[in-house]
From Swiss-Prot:
Annotated family: Belongs to the universal ribosomal protein uL24 family.
Functional description taken from the UniProt entry: One of two assembly initiator proteins, it binds directly to the 5'-end of the 23S rRNA, where it nucleates assembly of the 50S subunit. One of the proteins that surrounds the polypeptide exit tunnel on the outside of the subunit.
Gene name of the encoded protein: rplX
Name assigned to this protein: Large ribosomal subunit protein uL24
The keyword Ribosomal protein appears for this protein: yes
Disulfide pattern: none
Amino acid sequence: MKTANKQTKLHVRKNDTVVVIAGNDKGKTGKVLKAYPQACRVIVEGVNIRKRHVRPSQSHPQGAIIEREFPIHASNVKKG
């Protein structure tokens, strides 16, 4: 992970359409939902979907297993 003091710049921004060029989701396209410049990672819509176990709460009274996107490294995407 990059240090907090160093400024980093990503080649993609939020709402850019990107193509995944490496990894399990290679070839998929999606919109960048969120970018983390310090960690050089981005969250792409419909890519790197994992299951997340959540505790019981008002929105999920019995708890649940939800699927959501997790970040991937910015070097694995290109603008498309």
